A protein has these predicted regions:
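Pepsin/retropepsin-fold aspartyl endopeptidases
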Residues: 1-123
C-alpha cells in the first residue's frame, strides 16, 4: 500500500504484482508492455472506445488472465498500453503497477475502501 495512492499487491500467474485501485474506472487494465513477463493472455480485440485521463486508447484487447487478490479471483481485464499511468505512479510512489482494478471488479469480489484512511478490506 502506498500513502499517496490505493495500491495493493496481488498475483498474476503466480508472480507478485502491484495494482492501482481506481474507483473512477469502469474497466480494469493490465499493462500490455508486461505481456511476456507475466504471461498475459491476449484475447480478441475490444470493439468499444476507451477514453481516460490520457485520452483515447487504441489497440485494446480483451485479456484472458486473472488477478488473484486476498483469496479472490478478479476477472475481466483489458490489455492496453497504460505506460503513462505506470510511469506517473512509479514517479510519485516508487511502485511500478501492472494494472488497474476498476470499481465493478472491486464490487465483484467484495472489496471495500476507506478513502480517508486508505484502508482496503474484503467482505
Amino acid at each position: 500500500m502506498s500513502e499517496e495512492r490505493l495500491i495493493v499487491e496481488g498475483k498474476v500467474n503466480g508472480k507478485d504484482a502491484y495494482f492501482l485501485l481506481d474507483s473512477g474506472a469502469s474497466v480494469g487494465f493490465l499493462n500490455k508492455d508486461k505481456k511476456k513477463e507475466y504471461g498475459l493472455s491476449e484475447g480478441r480485440r475490444f470493439e468499444g472506445t476507451i477514453i481516460g485521463a490520457g485520452g483515447e486508447m487504441r489497440n485494446v484487447m480483451h485479456c484472458d488472465t486473472f488477478v488473484h487478490f486476498g483469496g479472490k479471483v478478479i476477472p475481466q481485464f483489458l490489455l492496453a498500453d497504460i505506460s503513462g499511468v505506470v510511469k506517473s505512479i512509479k514517479k510519485e510512489t516508487g511502485i511500478e503497477i501492472l494494472g488497474i482494478i476498476s470499481l465493478p471488479q472491486m464490487s465483484m469480489i467484495g472489496l471495500n475502501l476507506d478513502i480517508n484512511s486508505l484502508e482496503v478490506w474484503l467482505e
